[in-house]
Amino acid sequence: MKQTVYIASPESQQIHVWNLNHEGALTLTQVVDVPGQVQPMVVSPDKRYLYVGVRPEFRVLAYRIAPDDGALTFAAESALPGSPTHISTDHQGQFVFVGSYNAGNVSVTRLEDGLPVGVVDVVEGLDGCHSANISPDNRTLWVPALKQDRICLFTVSEDGHLVAQDPAEVTTVEGAGPRHMVFHPNEQYAYCVNELNSSVDVWELKDPHGNIECVQTLDMMPENFSDTRWAADIHITPDGRHLYACDRTASLITVFSVSEDGSVLSKEGFQPTETQPRGFNVDHSGKYLIAAGQKSHHISVYEIVGEQGLLHEKGRYAVGQGPMWVVVNAH
């Protein structure tokens, strides 16, 4: 398995393309100059395209991915109704979902043969919309509205329209600020990192009565932490055994172990990392974690070690200015 790591740096308007080898070392293979401040990125389900959101002219760009080395070639673009904060796709590669924090909306862009061809739906009134996350069964779009302490739930119709479910939302504790999400591989649980109180919620997707319930909330910060809480990103290993979340003020990554059924998180430790870690990701083997420092302009690679999933630094690399997003593609 070959793996390519993409790093988006909006301040220098670049995507750095790296080869990740089996020992966790990175080799720079390409630097792409992007026509705008590039922020969120996602790889298409068939691994043929990288979709990126740019501003100040709000667009989604599609780059064709070379199957041999992961190199990028521009392929298409489509306008967006707000500044892109987060970008994702459905599992069949029919639609791109874009959450916009500033615009307070989530939009759906239709794909034709992998290329974006236009917005088919926009839902407004999502104050502080920070991500759009499709459930493993491709049926429910989870959309955190950070400033409203709620996660809105939509069914995606065949033509890409978003239909509010019943119930239409779940709520967090006041002042939590739900931000980004991941799902357990067993498709029974979701995990949401809350920006404003630096906590992680565990959501049971369906209990025996068909309800969605928060079954655990864990503080992700050290006990003696007294500064402003400012959590950012969350990821889980492919085997579902380890979960990680980062805080930008403390510049640390919190390490969690996950119970076998996915219902319980246990805090295992903390890893100091790059300054102001806005984004990170886990590779497809589950052996390595790559974190980007928005203020350090570097990335660090960590090996995931042992039953606790603790992080051991393997290497550090300079990238563009203000790196914010990390994506790993296996090919």
UniProtKB/Swiss-Prot annotation:
What EC number(s) has UniProt assigned to this enzyme? 3.1.1.31
Which InterPro entries did the record assign?
A: 6-phosphogluconolactonase_YbhE (IPR022528), Cycloisomerase_2 (IPR050282), Lactonase_7-beta_prop (IPR019405), N2O_reductase_N (IPR011045), WD40/YVTN_repeat-like_dom_sf (IPR015943)
- Catalytic function, reaction form: 6-phospho-D-glucono-1,5-lactone + H2O = 6-phospho-D-gluconate + H(+)
Record keywords, A-Z = Acetylation, Carbohydrate metabolism, Glucose metabolism, Hydrolase
Gene Ontology biological-process entries = glucose metabolic process; pentose-phosphate shunt, oxidative branch
Q: What is any Pfam family matched here?
A: Lactonase
Q: Name one molecular function that GO assigns to this entry.
A: 6-phosphogluconolactonase activity
Pathway terms, separated by semicolons: Carbohydrate degradation; pentose phosphate pathway; D-ribulose 5-phosphate from D-glucose 6-phosphate (oxidative stage): step 2/3
List residues modified as N6-acetyllysine.
287
A GO CC annotation given for this chain: cytosol
- HAMAP family attached to this UniProt entry: 6P_gluconolactonase
The Swiss-Prot or TrEMBL record describes its family as follows: Belongs to the cycloisomerase 2 family.
Protein purpose: Catalyzes the hydrolysis of 6-phosphogluconolactone to 6-phosphogluconate.
State the protein's name.
6-phosphogluconolactonase
The organism's taxonomy opens as: Bacteria, Pseudomonadati, Pseudomonadota, Gammaproteobacteria, Enterobacterales
Q: Which gene encodes it?
A: pgl
